[in-house]
Amino acid sequence: MLNRQQIQSYADHGYLVIEKLFDSEQVNRSLAAIDELLDPNNPDKPYEYEPQDGETVRRIWSPTQKHAAFKEMAADPHLLDCIEALIGENVLFHYSKLNMKGPKVGSVVEWHQDFSYYPHTNTDLVTALIFLDDASVTNGCLRVVPGSHRRGLVSHEVDGFFRGKAQGTDESLAVDIEVPAGSVLFLHCLTLHASACNTSQLPRRTFLPAYRAADAFPIYFGSHAAHNESGIQLLRGRRAKIARVDAGAYLLPIAEREFGSLYEVQEGSHLRKALASMETAGYAVTEPTAS
């Protein structure tokens, strides 16, 4: 369980690092599970490739639904104790993914707030980034802007359309999250974060289960909302009968064209790719409004 100082640090800075929350045995089991999912003989290929070579996998979708190792890790009691301390006693599993930066590849992830992709009635949403390799500047560790969650949701639009990247981030304020394997970064849904490409000879693989308070409900439209909700699972406490609503207005993630991932919408490849070649995520699409 987190102490008061750690909880306050998360509230103040929008993130919290707990080193080596998972031991080497748990980490190695997860790495072995990745190898199983990437086995060429595996008929299910729930992943996305790096565009540079078309062979290196940069993301595995919904690993908790694909392998028991990740389902168990996402429900680890020590991990959930931390989540409960940060967002309250009623905890829902939201979604999961595996982000992987291959050696000498590893796509850039531009500055963004996770909440921009899935606005909810309140902001008690947190992602646990579980590092399965040592994370360093050279292999593209995560970077965060401390306290940026206090700014609220910023625009992630380009030319009137959602592009999943925040404009005008002051990178001089950023902190590099360099941690050993088994460590966890708890990230507030409004904290600005990014990562560079991997310039090292070593991979950087990260498992990301996301959680939300039971009284936080999605407010965006499009089939993506319904798609995510089908995987929601109550992990602690009880389901909510009411939606807790923060005051304010949120810009909805309405894109120019359908896309399958953060990578595609940030790099703009969704504007060029055939829809059949993307596992589209169901985000709403509309014409830009007149200015």
Placement of each model-derived feature along the sequence:
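Short, surface-exposed loop/helix-turn segments at secondary-structure junctions
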Residues: 113, 159-173, 201-203, 221-230
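Non-heme Fe(II)/2-oxoglutarate
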Residues: 40, 44, 191-192, 196-291
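Double-stranded beta-helix
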Residues: 135-196, 216
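Short, conserved beta-strand element in jelly-roll/cupin
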Residues: 86, 119-137, 178-179, 186, ...
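Short, structured patches in soluble enzyme cores that scaffold and shape functional sites
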Residues: 97, 102, 113, 130-134, ...
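Glycine-rich phosphate/pyrophosphate-binding beta-alpha loops
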Residues: 114-116, 125, 189, 194-198
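Phosphate/oxyanion-binding loops and surfaces in catalytic or ligand/nucleic-acid-binding neighborhoods
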Residues: 36-40, 89, 135, 151, ...
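Non-heme Fe(II)-dependent double-stranded beta-helix
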Residues: 1-13, 18-111, 116-120
